[in-house]
């Protein structure tokens, strides 16, 4: 769990996301409150539940990116799901409980990777010893006797010196291309189960039943020392991981620090006064989500998981519906409402130039691999931002994603030819490539 203050969290988010300060403040406070809760003594600690967040704003303004970056900052188990993929229990589709099961799978994977990383040094030492055993096979033990005692001591010293010499050569990479034959763990038998929609849980359980078949078997393989070293490190690191401790740690991490991001929550609202079959199903999804958000216990193949302290962040554009169209019980479980604003021309300019991995830097790095030096002038950046904003206003507003389309169209010719040399992108160049398309609404709908 991160110990960053809300100000530090917002500063980190500013490196990747432009604007949306209200949303950043809300998620920063929510994340800091997770840490604050851990400092409170029991029994009050268990009574403090996270305040779930509802983000409201058009597509492409940073809702998903804020949640994704937040999970990276916190190092917490994180999963993003689409509300439209789930259906009411009894209908064909995924059950909402699979959200928590998938979150546990993510936590198990992350916890295992962290445990392997912690044990890597010990695993490297063990792998090194196994390779040295192959390069320097131990001589058969001679029966100890009166005449054999002294030579055995000398041989032992010689073997130790030779082993140290080989160890030094191995670390210097002098044996990397040498082929050796060694015994490694045989890969476990894989069973892929193709399940019909709505039967994913059954398929997962069936796959788990057959997963252990063939585990522990050995096979002899011939490979280069460099490849063998990598494989043996993974094998030895896996041996050092305690599976029971790993499961317990992962489940605790999910319960205390898990974050679930539910996108497109507006698509499961009931619209209007009439209630069609689809509307009934949508309301059913909301009712099924209620226990998860409120706090319940979900059964997973690794154990029971309580959702009382998992943070839920829901988001939606709410263009055809309103947050008040959600069922009242679910509205009450999402107490923090944050509205994200549409992007302005200045926001588009900042997205193109100010973030750590802005689009202009990405294209410059890509084309630099073939000797093309892209230079973006201020006038070119200004025109790109204006055109992206203009097309969003005239057609569908897809937010910052419009910049991908605009940039691809702008640099299509340069990327295709990829001739070494300098290429200057100024206002005139942008107008020459995109001006006519942007002005004509009929063309912009199909091209940009």
UniProtKB/Swiss-Prot annotation:
Keywords: ATP-binding, Chaperone, Cytoplasm, Nucleotide-binding. The keyword Chaperone applies. The keyword Cell cycle does not apply. ATP binds at residues 18, 60-65, 263, 329, 401. Its main location: cytoplasm. GO terms for biological process: protein unfolding; proteolysis involved in protein catabolic process. It holds the Pfam family AAA_2. One of its GO terms (cellular component) is HslUV protease complex. It is found in: Cytoplasm. One of its GO terms (molecular function) is ATP hydrolysis activity. Belongs to the ClpX chaperone family. HslU subfamily. A double ring-shaped homohexamer of HslV is capped on each side by a ring-shaped HslU homohexamer. The assembly of the HslU/HslV complex is dependent on binding of ATP. ATPase subunit of a proteasome-like degradation complex; this subunit has chaperone activity. The binding of ATP and its subsequent hydrolysis by HslU are essential for unfolding of protein substrates subsequently hydrolyzed by HslV. HslU recognizes the N-terminal part of its protein substrates and unfolds these before they are guided to HslV for hydrolysis. This is ATP-dependent protease ATPase subunit HslU. The lineage of its organism: Bacteria, Pseudomonadati, Pseudomonadota, Betaproteobacteria, Neisseriales.
């Amino acid at each position: 769990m991160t110990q960053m203050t809300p100000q530090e969290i917002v500063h980190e988010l500013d490196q990747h996301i432009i604007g949306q300060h209200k949303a950043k403040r809300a998620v920063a406070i929510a994340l800091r409150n997770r840490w604050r809760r851990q400092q409170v003594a029991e029994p009050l600690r268990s009574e403090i539940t996270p305040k779930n967040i509802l983000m409201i704003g058009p597509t492409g303004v940073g809702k998903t990116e804020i949640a994704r970056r937040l999970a990276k900052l916190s190092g917490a188990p994180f999963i993003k799901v689409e509300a439209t993929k789930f259906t009411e229990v009894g209908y064909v589709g995924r059950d909402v409980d699979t959200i928590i099961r998938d979150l546990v799978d993510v936590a198990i994977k992350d916890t295992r990777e962290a445990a392997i990383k912690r044990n890597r040094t010990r695993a490297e030492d063990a792998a090194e010893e196994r390779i040295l055993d192959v390069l320097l096979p131990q001589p058969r033990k001679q029966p100890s006797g009166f005449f054999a005692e002294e030579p055995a001591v000398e041989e032992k010293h010689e073997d130790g010196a030779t082993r140290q010499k080989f160890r030094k050569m191995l670390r210097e990479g002098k044996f990397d291309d040498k082929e050796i034959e060694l015994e490694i763990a045989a890969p476990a038998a894989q069973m892929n189960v193709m399940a019909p929609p709505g039967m994913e849980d059954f398929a997962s359980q069936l796959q788990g039943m057959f997963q252990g078949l063939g585990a522990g078997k050995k096979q002899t393989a011939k490979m280069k020392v460099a490849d063998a070293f990598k494989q043996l490190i993974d094998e030895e690191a896996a041996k050092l991981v305690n599976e029971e401790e790993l499961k317990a740690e992962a489940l605790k991490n999910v319960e205390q620090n898990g974050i679930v991001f539910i996108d497109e929550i507006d698509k499961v609202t009931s619209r209007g006064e009439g209630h069609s079959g689809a509307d009934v199903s949508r309301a059913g999804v909301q009712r099924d989500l209620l226990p998860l958000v409120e706090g319940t216990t979900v059964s997973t193949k690794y154990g029971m998981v309580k959702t009382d302290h998992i943070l839920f962040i829901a988001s939606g554009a709410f263009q055809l519906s309103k947050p008040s169209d959600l069922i009242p019980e679910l509205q009450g479980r999402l107490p923090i409402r944050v509205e994200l604003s549409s992007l302005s021309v200045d926001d588009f300019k900042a997205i193109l130039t100010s973030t750590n991995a802005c689009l202009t830097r990405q294209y410059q790095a890509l084309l630099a691999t073939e000797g093309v030096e892209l230079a973006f002038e201020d006038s070119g950046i200004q025109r790109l931002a204006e055109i992206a904003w203009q097309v969003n206003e005239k057609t569908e507003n897809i937010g910052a994603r419009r910049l991908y389309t605009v940039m691809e169209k702008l640099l299509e010719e340069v990327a295709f030819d990829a001739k070494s040399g300098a290429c200057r992108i100024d206002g005139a160049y942008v107008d020459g490539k995109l001006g006519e398309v942007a002005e004509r609404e009929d063309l912009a709908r199909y091209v940009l």
